[in-house]
Each structure stands twice: as C-alpha cells, then as structure tokens.
Regions:
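Amphipathic alpha-helical oligomerization/assembly segments
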Residues: 134-149
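Glycan-processing catalytic domains of CAZymes
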Residues: 1-137
Length: 151
C-alpha cells in the first residue's frame, strides 16, 4: 500500500476487490474494499453479520463497496435499504446477471459486466447516492394513490 500510495499520490484511491468479507488487516492495504460481490437474492437473504461483519465497525462507510447484480424492479429498493442499514458507502447495482452455464467462472455464459445496467437502474442508484431514495419512494406511493382515485 505504501509503495502504491507513493507512486500514485494521494489523489488516486487504492481499491481492492476480494468480493467478499476480508480480514480486517486487509483494510490497511487499501482505501476502499469491495466486500460484497454477488446477486441480489443472496444480498437480501443474508444477515448483516454475513455481509458486513462487526469487525468493520468503527471504519467509515466510504471504505466499503458492494456490487450487487441481478437486481429487479421488485427488489431494487430493498437492496438499497439494506445497503443503507449496513452503512455501505459505495454501491454498484446492475440488473445484468451471472451464470456459468456452458462457460466457466472466468468466462461465464452470462456476465453482469458485459453490458451496462438497464436505463431504469440509473435513476435508482443516483437517488441512493444523493440520499433521496426514501423520499422518492414515498412520493411515488402518493402519486400511485392519486392516480388510482382519479380512475
């Protein structure tokens, strides 16, 4: 870390991607760690401790990045809520999926990084980043009720 920091300077973040929880000592080797990289169903079904263990308490949220693929319009809000509850500072969401299929782990049949997220994902993640997603959710619910009464 010290060699990289000296070579890159203070303005370049050093990010590691173990893709899952890592030893606390690894946090001294980076600025940000990707500590979750898997699908939305697993993200929602696992406990806080399984996704973001107590060993990370006391570290600022900006040090953690979660990558969640396979989100749907039905679960995206729950994924964002869980990221907020866990206090993760960075979140990458995509509706693209991972499936080994006839490929391999290195060259899967479906790779969530082959294509960008669908256009409907972008406003959700933008709202999460800005911290206004809960407000937008309440506004959408009110608009839906008004529309139902008008019909």
């Amino acid at each position: 870390y010290k060699l990289l920091r000296a070579a890159l300077g203070a303005d370049v973040p050093i990010i590691i991607n173990p893709g899952s929880n890592t030893r606390l000592e690894m946090m001294s080797a980076c600025d940000i760690a990707v500590t979750y990289e898997s699908d939305a169903t697993k993200y929602l079904s696992r406990t806080r401790q399984e996704i973001h263990p107590d060993q990370y308490q006391g570290l600022p949220s900006w040090r953690f990045w979660h990558i969640v693929h396979g989100i749907t319009k039905e679960n995206v809000d729950k994924v964002c809520e869980k990221a907020d509850d866990i206090d993760v500072g960075h979140l990458y969401l995509t509706d693209q999926t991972f499936a080994v299929g006839t490929g391999s782990e290195d060259t899967p049949q479906e790779d969530p990084y082959d294509d960008p997220p669908s256009p409907w994902v972008v406003p959700k993640i933008r709202s999460w980043i800005k911290g206004v997603l809960p407000l937008e959710q309440r506004l959408s619910a009110v608009e839906a009720k008004v529309a139902a009464k008008e019909n």
